A protein has these predicted regions:
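Extended ligand-binding clefts on enzyme/binding-domain cores
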Residues: 1-145, 152-158, 180
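C-terminal functional modules
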Residues: 122-227
Length: 227
């Protein structure tokens, strides 16, 4: 399982570091001697994300123990849903869209989007206790963006459309406080949702490699958001 750090923080993990979409890619096309390891890592991370997500809200902790439970090693705030945790829905949703190996990821997106929809699409806060208790009411572009990517795995077309449109309608982030969490996550989310963050399958001697894309299709209200 991925560690938070190889040195003094090697007794904990971070759900946002679990990237099964990439592990699966390396398991298919990485060095042959490493492929079995990456295949196991992908399976472990898929299971971990399910364990880490709260059963009602879908929120995940910023830092966690290896069994999926939150770990507040620096106080309660490090066990809450905070900036690192914004990225987690993007991780499982891209994995679902690229590889489609874990049907549980669809429920994770549904659960998370259902929670944030209930808090007000234009006003929901960005820091929460896992049970849905609000900690900070800042409506952050970075979280709006990654919640939009969650539509890649959602089964509720009408709800997924709301979150995708919220991503699309974001102003370009200009905050100097969260230049990464707002700025870069917004950029990455637009790439994911538009299908421009791609897997290029290796094709020896091929002039043009076939691109495998992810994209959110804005559906009719009765259809699903992810194909």
């Amino acid at each position: 399982m991925i560690l938070f750090s190889p040195d003094e923080r090697n007794n904990m993990t971070d759900a946002s570091y679990h990237l099964p979409a990439f592990y699966e890619l390396w398991a298919r096309w990485g060095p042959e001697e490493d492929r079995a390891l990456w295949a196991r890592a992908a399976a472990v991370s898929r299971d971990y994300l399910v364990k880490a997500a709260h059963s009602k809200t879908g929120l995940v902790p910023n830092f966690g123990q290896f069994d999926g439970s939150p770990w507040g090693f620096r106080g309660p705030e490090t066990a809450a849903f905070r900036e690192d945790a914004w990225r987690v829905a993007m991780n499982w949703s891209v994995d679902r869209s690229w590889w489609g190996k874990d049907s549980r990821q669809r429920e994770l997106s549904d659960r998370l989007q259902r929670f944030f929809e209930s808090q007000g699409m234009e006003t929901y806060g960005d820091n929460w206790k896992l049970d849905g208790t609000l900690i900070r009411d800042r409506h952050s572009p970075g979280l709006v963006a990654t919640n939009g990517v969650a539509s890649l795995a959602s089964t509720d077309g009408a709800r997924a459309r709301k979150f995708t449109e919220a991503l699309w309608n974001l102003d370009v982030p200009s905050s100097k406080v969260f230049r990464y969490y707002d700025g870069l996550l917004s950029l990455m989310s637009l790439l994911h949702a538009s299908g421009r963050f791609q897997v290029i399958e290796p094709k020896p001697r091929a002039v043009n490699a076939r691109a495998s894309r992810t994209a959110v299709t804005l559906p009719r209200a009765s259809s699903t958001a992810a194909r």
